[in-house]
Amino acid sequence: MKFTKSLLLLIVAVFASSNAAETFSNFQVTNSEASSPCVTTPVELKVNTCQSACGSILNVLPVTGSTSKFTFNQFGAQDTKCAATPTSSNEFTCVDGKSKVAIGSTTYSVVCVPDKTNSSESDSSDSTRIGASFALAAAALLSMIAL
């Protein structure tokens, strides 16, 4: 009976630590063209979400059923602050699966910006949740050893 309780505590701890996922609200896109460098924070997105895709890079929502094509709105070069209405909407395809995407001959660097507005997903709550999970796992292991 004690062994079963300990095993259940260990399983709960593993699930609790795996649920400490980071959420993302914005994206930063840098244009590689020197003639029209443009950094947008955030990029205007079709869907304001962040997903794991193209290997290790976190990108915007894939285009219908595609795992390598994504959509974002491209700002015009005349808009130096990149704050006006986007000039067009584009699809981009992952190039190296890490951090670069290309539209035609232009390469963009895409970086997810962590969402810090949601208090339940803040750094402190994540570290607290993870710390509590490890403490629970340690307690479960100690009680199993004591048997």
UniProtKB/Swiss-Prot annotation:
Signal sequence bounds:
1-20
A GO CC term attached to the entry:
lamellar body
Superkingdom to which the source organism belongs: Eukaryota
Residues that make up the propeptide are 119-147
User: Which is one GO molecular function term here?
Assistant: actin filament binding
Q: Which UniProt keywords apply?
A: Cell membrane, Glycoprotein, GPI-anchor, Lipoprotein, Membrane, Signal
Cellular localization per UniProt: Cell membrane
Membrane topology classification: Lipid-anchor; GPI-anchor
Post-translation: what modifications? The GPI-like-anchor contains a phosphoceramide group, rather than a phosphatidyl group.
Q: Which residues carry attached sugars according to the database record?
A: 118
Task: Please give the sites of covalent lipid attachment annotated as GPI-like-anchor amidated asparagine.
Answer: 118
Coiled-coil stretches: none
Give the family from UniProt.
Belongs to the ponticulin family.
Q: What is this protein called?
A: Ponticulin-like protein C4
Q: Which organism is it from?
A: Dictyostelium discoideum (Social amoeba)
Which gene specifies this protein's sequence? ponC4
